[in-house]
Design a protein with these regions (language model features):
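Acidic catalytic motifs of isoprenoid enzymes
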Residues: 1-215
């Protein structure tokens, strides 16, 4: 099986928005960015799962995080599937195949992707277990950094690793937060059906508006 080709196909099915730029990236960088996107999409699908209970989401996400933290020079074939036991029929393919996405990136940068994904999975577990209770700007900043701003930092590291490109990491965080603000506003109705309201306070709505300025 050609893992790179398979990953691009899953990426195309998952998000054409991200597939298009990643598909034309040079070799090496393409595998690294595809690995990062698919690993994070894998955990995002669990966080946003429509039927899993929040407690279950937390357990699954923490299992992924712990497995990634234990990685040395790769992962055993069943490293992640052990944690998924009993939920194989509930989770999407992109989540079930996270091991493959984790080993897609070149060895010289893969551990950085594991680290970022593990940290994000832990943060998602925390927020899911408290039902995304965000009551002030401080909470919103923590959430948007944890699930989006940190992606900007990872991408900055990938550019630097590939060819030494230097980026403004504060702006990378702000851009990630802005994109997450768009996602929150766009998915507001869906979130409300599961009892999650990110914008219940006027102050938070103002913060959303300030985040949108960067994009």
């Amino acid at each position: 099986m050609d893992l790179r080709r398979d990953a691009l196909q899953i990426l195309k099915e998952t998000s054409r928005t991200f597939y298009i730029p990643i598909s034309i990236m040079p070799s090496g960088l393409q595998e690294a960015v595809a690995s990062a996107y698919l690993c994070m999409r894998a955990i995002d699908e669990i966080e946003d799962h429509a039927t899993l209970e929040n407690h279950t989401k937390g357990i699954l996400l923490q299992s992924i995080s712990q497995t990634l933290q234990a990685g040395v020079d790769g992962f055993a074939v069943d490293a992640f599937s052990i944690g998924f036991k009993g939920y194989e029929d509930s989770l999407p393919e992109v989540s079930l195949r996270i091991r493959e996405w984790a080993i897609l990136a070149p060895e010289s940068i893969a551990p950085r992707i594991w680290d970022a994904t593990a940290a994000m999975a832990d943060r998602m577990a925390y927020w899911s277990q408290i039902n995304w209770k965000i009551t002030n700007e401080y909470d919103l900043d923590r959430y948007t950094f944890g699930v989006a701003g940190a992606v900007g930092l990872l991408l900055s590291d990938l550019w630097s690793w590939y060819d030494g490109t230097t980026t403004n990491r504060m702006e990378a965080i702000a851009f990630g937060r802005g994109l997450q603000a768009v996602n929150i506003l766009r998915n507001n109705s869906e979130d409300l059906t599961r009892g999650v309201n990110f914008s219940r306070r006027v102050g938070i709505t103002r913060t959303f508006n300030s985040m949108l300025v960067v994009i």
